[in-house]
C-alpha cells in the first residue's frame, strides 16, 4: 500500500521507495533534516530531496527513473565541432561552491529555485567530506558552466547543471561522461525524465530496476584519485 511517511529530527531509516505515492509521482516522505548521514542514506537507497524554499523537506523516489549509461550520452557531431573550437578549460572539483551558486540562479521564466541556501550548505558539507563533486567549464578565469552531484560507489547521482554561455553545460556533461567511463562508473542517475535529458540519451527505467542496479553498484570501490582536483581534456574525435 502506498503511503507517505513523516520524518522527525531523529535519524531513522527511510521507508522503502516502493511505498512512494503515484500522485505526486515518487513522493515518499516529508520532514527530517539535511544532515550528511541522512542525505547519504537517501542516495544510497535511491531517494533524493527536492522542495521549494517555502516547503518542508520533501523526499522523492519517482517511477520511472531517468538514467544515463556512461558511453551512451549523445554528443552530436555539430556539438563536437562546436566544442573543439572553444578555448574553454574544464576542471573537476575546482569550484564546487560556485557551481552550486550558478545552478541556484533562477532559470528563465522561473521566479525561484529549489537549490536553497539550506540545500547549498548541506551539499557543501558533502563536498568537504568527499561525497559531492563538481565539473566546471571556464572561459579564461570566468566560470561559464558546470554541474554537480554525488558519487555512490560506481553510480553518479546528477543534481543540477547551469550555463552562462551556449553549450557550456553540455561540455560539462561530455566531460563527466568521459571521466566516469575512464574511472569505471556504470550508471548516472538523472532522477526525473524531461525532454532535454531525453535528447541527450537518457533512458526511463522502472524504479525497481533502478534500485536493483543501485544495490549492485553502490558498494563497489572506485579509484581513490577519481575526484582529486584536476583538469579534463575533452576527447572529441
Curated annotation (Swiss-Prot):
Its main location: cytoplasm. It catalyses: N-terminal L-lysyl-[protein] + L-leucyl-tRNA(Leu) = N-terminal L-leucyl-L-lysyl-[protein] + tRNA(Leu) + H(+); N-terminal L-arginyl-[protein] + L-leucyl-tRNA(Leu) = N-terminal L-leucyl-L-arginyl-[protein] + tRNA(Leu) + H(+); L-phenylalanyl-tRNA(Phe) + an N-terminal L-alpha-aminoacyl-[protein] = an N-terminal L-phenylalanyl-L-alpha-aminoacyl-[protein] + tRNA(Phe). Pfam families: Leu_Phe_trans. Keywords: Acyltransferase, Cytoplasm, Transferase. One of its GO terms (biological process) is protein catabolic process. It is found in: Cytoplasm. GO terms for molecular function: leucyl-tRNA--protein transferase activity. One of its GO terms (cellular component) is cytoplasm. Its EC number is 2.3.2.6. Gene3D superfamilies: Leucyl/phenylalanyl-tRNA-protein transferase, C-terminal domain, Leucyl/phenylalanyl-tRNA-protein transferase, N-terminal domain. Functions in the N-end rule pathway of protein degradation where it conjugates Leu, Phe and, less efficiently, Met from aminoacyl-tRNAs to the N-termini of proteins containing an N-terminal arginine or lysine. Belongs to the L/F-transferase family. PANTHER family: LEUCYL/PHENYLALANYL-TRNA--PROTEIN TRANSFERASE, LEUCYL_PHENYLALANYL-TRNA--PROTEIN TRANSFERASE. NCBIfam families: aat. This is Leucyl/phenylalanyl-tRNA--protein transferase. It comes from Shewanella baltica (strain OS155 / ATCC BAA-1091).
Amino acid at each position: 500500500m502506498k503511503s507517505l511517511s513523516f520524518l522527525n529530527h531523529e535519524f531513522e531509516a527511510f521507508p522503502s521507495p516502493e511505498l512512494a505515492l503515484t500522485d505526486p509521482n515518487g513522493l515518499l516522505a516529508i520532514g527530517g533534516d539535511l544532515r550528511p548521514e541522512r542525505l547519504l542514506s537517501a542516495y544510497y537507497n535511491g531517494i533524493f530531496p527536492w522542495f521549494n524554499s517555502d516547503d518542508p523537506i520533501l523526499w522523492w523516489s519517482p517511477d520511472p527513473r531517468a538514467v544515463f549509461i556512461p558511453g551512451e550520452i549523445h554528443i552530436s557531431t555539430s556539438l563536437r565541432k562546436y566544442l573543439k573550437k572553444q578555448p574553454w578549460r574544464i576542471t573537476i572539483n575546482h569550484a564546487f561552491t560556485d557551481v552550486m551558486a550558478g545552478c541556484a540562479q533562477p532559470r528563465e521564466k522561473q521566479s525561484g529555485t529549489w537549490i536553497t541556501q539550506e540545500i547549498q550548505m548541506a551539499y557543501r558539507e558533502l563536498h568537504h567530506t568527499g561525497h559531492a563533486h563538481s565539473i566546471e567549464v571556464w572561459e579564461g578565469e570566468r566560470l561559464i558552466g558546470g554541474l554537480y552531484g554525488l558519487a555512490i560507489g560506481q553510480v553518479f547521482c546528477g543534481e543540477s547543471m547551469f550555463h552562462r554561455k551556449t553549450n557550456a553545460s553540455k561540455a560539462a556533461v561530455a566531460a563527466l561522461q568521459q571521466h566516469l567511463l575512464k574511472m569505471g562508473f556504470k550508471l548516472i542517475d538523472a532522477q526525473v525524465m524531461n525532454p532535454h535529458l531525453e535528447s541527450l540519451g537518457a533512458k526511463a527505467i522502472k524504479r525497481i530496476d533502478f534500485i536493483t542496479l543501485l544495490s549492485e553498484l553502490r558498494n563497489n570501490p572506485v579509484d581513490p584519485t577519481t575526484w582529486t582536483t584536476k583538469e579534463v581534456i575533452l576527447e572529441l574525435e
